[in-house]
C-alpha cells in the first residue's frame, strides 16, 4: 500500500486536550482497518463498543464506555451490505446522542447513495434523505471525502468537511510512474473533464476527453418527473398551443479529443464501480496509440466481477484509496493498488477536536476540484 510517511517527530499527532472518543461503527472486522490506522496516527485507543447482528438481522449497538460530555468520532466505512452499514451508523449516532455526548462527528470517507443525488424520472434524491436521517439521528458534523457531487453538502444542516484525495493520487503519479512526464490525463466522459483538467494543470500535462459510446450513462439523466402530454393531445385541448419538445439524444461515434499516441494514458474519476466504461475507454486509448493505461479514482467500489474484468483488460494498473475496503478484490486482481489516506482523516479529526482551523486541509483547492 502506498502512503505518505510523516517525519518521525510527527508519527503521533498532537491531541492537545482530552475528551476524545473514537469508535468504529462496523460489525464487519474487515472494514475496521482504516479505523485502526487513524487511531494509531492519533495515538489513541479505539472506543469500546459492540456492533452486531441479531438472529432476525436487526442491528444492535452497545456502547461500553462513558461518552458524556465528550467529542465522539464515529468512523464508518461502507461494506458490501450498504444498508446495514447505514443502520450501524445511525443507531450508534443515536446511542451517543442519548448518552449525552458533547458532539458527534461522523467520519464517512465514502458517502453511500451519493450517486443517487439527482432526480431521475419518478425516482427520489436518496442522498438528501440519508443526509436528513443522519442529522435527525444526532450527527453534529460530517467528515467525508470526494463527494460524487459537491452539491450534496447542501443537503445537510450541519457542517460538512469534504476532504480531497487528489494530493495523494498526484503524489502517487509523481513517485510511482517514472515516465509520467510523457503522460496525458484522460476524462472517460465529458462529465469528468473538470476533474481531469485539475489533475492535468497540477502535473503540467496535456488532457484528452473521450466522447461518444463510452461515456457514462449518468450523463444521459432524464430529469422529467411526470410524463408530458403528447403534443397532439395538448394541441387538441388548446389549438393555439404547440409545446416544443427536446430532440432525442443520439450518441455520436466514439471520439478521443486530444493526442494520446505514444503516451501513457491516466484516466481519472471519483468512483470505480461498474468498470464497463473504463474498459471501453482503455480499448479506445490503445487503438489511438497509448502504450500504458492507468486508472485512478478515490473510491474503489469494484462491485461484482469488476476485478476479473480489469485483470483481463488493457488496463495496466488501477489505483484507488482505502476509503472503501477492497482487500478481496486485490487478491482477485493484482493490478489494483491502494493509496492510504488515513493521514488526512486523522488530521481533520485532530483539528476539529482541538478547535483548530480546517483551512490547512483545503489549501490550493479551487471551485472545480
UniProtKB/Swiss-Prot annotation:
> Which organism is this protein's natural source?
Bos taurus
Q: Name one GO molecular function term.
A: enzyme regulator activity
- Entry-linked SMART domains: Pribosyltran_N (SM01400)
Question: What keywords would UniProt list here?
Answer: Acetylation, Nucleotide biosynthesis, Phosphoprotein
Q: What is this protein called?
A: Phosphoribosyl pyrophosphate synthase-associated protein 2
Sites where N-acetylmethionine occurs are at 1
Keyword set includes Repeat: no
| Record lineage | Eukaryota, Metazoa, Chordata, Craniata, Vertebrata
Q: According to its record, what are the GO cellular component terms?
A: cytoplasm
Q: Does the keyword Translocase apply?
A: no
SUPFAM superfamilies assigned: PRTase-like
Which gene is transcribed and translated to give this protein?
PRPSAP2
Similarity remark: Belongs to the ribose-phosphate pyrophosphokinase family.
Residues with PTM Phosphoserine: 219, 227, 233
Q: Which GO terms describe its biological process?
A: 5-phosphoribose 1-diphosphate biosynthetic process; purine nucleotide biosynthetic process
Amino acid at each position: 500500500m502506498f502512503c505518505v510517511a510523516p517525519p518521525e517527530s510527527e508519527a503521533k499527532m498532537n491531541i492537545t486536550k482530552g475528551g476524545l472518543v473514537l469508535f468504529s461503527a462496523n460489525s464487519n472486522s474487515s472494514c475496521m482497518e482504516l479505523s485502526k490506522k487513524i487511531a494509531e496516527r492519533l495515538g489513541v485507543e479505539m472506543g469500546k463498543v459492540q456492533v452486531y447482528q441479531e438472529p432476525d438481522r436487526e442491528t444492535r449497538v452497545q456502547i461500553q464506555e462513558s461518552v458524556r460530555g465528550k467529542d465522539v468520532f464515529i468512523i464508518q466505512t461502507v461494506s458490501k451490505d450498504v444498508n446495514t452499514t447505514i443502520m450501524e451508523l445511525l443507531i450508534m449516532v443515536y446511542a451517543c446522542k442519548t448518552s449525552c455526548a458533547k458532539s458527534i462527528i461522523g467520519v464517512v470517507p465514502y458517502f453511500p447513495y451519493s450517486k443517487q443525488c439527482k432526480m431521475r424520472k419518478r425516482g427520489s434524491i436518496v442522498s438528501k434523505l440519508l443526509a436528513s436521517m443522519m442529522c435527525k439521528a444526532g450527527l453534529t458534523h460530517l467528515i467525508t471525502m470526494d463527494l460524487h457531487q459537491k452539491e450534496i453538502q447542501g443537503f445537510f444542516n450541519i457542517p460538512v468537511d469534504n476532504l480531497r484525495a487528489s494530493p495523494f493520487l498526484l503524489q502517487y503519479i509523481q513517485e510511482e510512474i517514472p515516465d509520467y512526464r510523457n503522460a496525458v490525463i484522460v476524462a472517460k466522459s465529458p462529465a469528468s473533464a473538470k476533474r481531469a483538467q485539475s489533475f492535468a494543470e497540477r502535473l503540467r500535462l496535456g488532457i484528452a476527453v473521450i466522447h461518444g459510446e463510452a461515456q457514462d450513462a449518468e450523463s444521459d439523466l432524464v430529469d422529467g418527473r411526470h410524463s408530458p402530454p403528447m403534443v397532439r393531445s395538448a394541441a387538441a385541448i388548446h389549438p393555439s398551443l404547440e409545446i416544443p419538445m427536446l430532440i432525442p439524444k443520439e450518441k455520436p461515434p466514439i471520439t478521443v479529443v486530444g493526442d494520446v499516441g505514444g503516451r501513457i494514458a491516466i484516466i481519472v474519476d471519483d468512483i470505480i464501480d461498474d468498470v464497463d466504461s473504463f474498459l471501453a475507454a482503455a480499448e479506445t486509448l490503445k487503438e489511438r496509440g497509448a502504450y500504458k493505461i492507468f486508472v485512478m479514482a478515490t473510491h474503489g467500489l469494484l462491485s461484482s466481477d469488476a476485478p476479473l474484468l480489469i485483470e483481463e483488460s488493457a488496463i495496466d494498473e488501477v489505483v484507488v484509496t482505502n476509503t472503501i475496503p477492497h482487500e478481496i478484490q486485490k487478491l482477485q486482481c493484482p493490478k489494483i493498488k491502494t493509496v492510504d489516506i488515513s493521514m488526512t482523516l486523522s488530521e481533520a479529526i485532530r483539528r476539529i477536536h482541538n478547535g483548530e482551523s480546517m483551512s490547512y486541509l483545503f489549501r490550493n483547492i479551487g471551485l472545480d476540484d
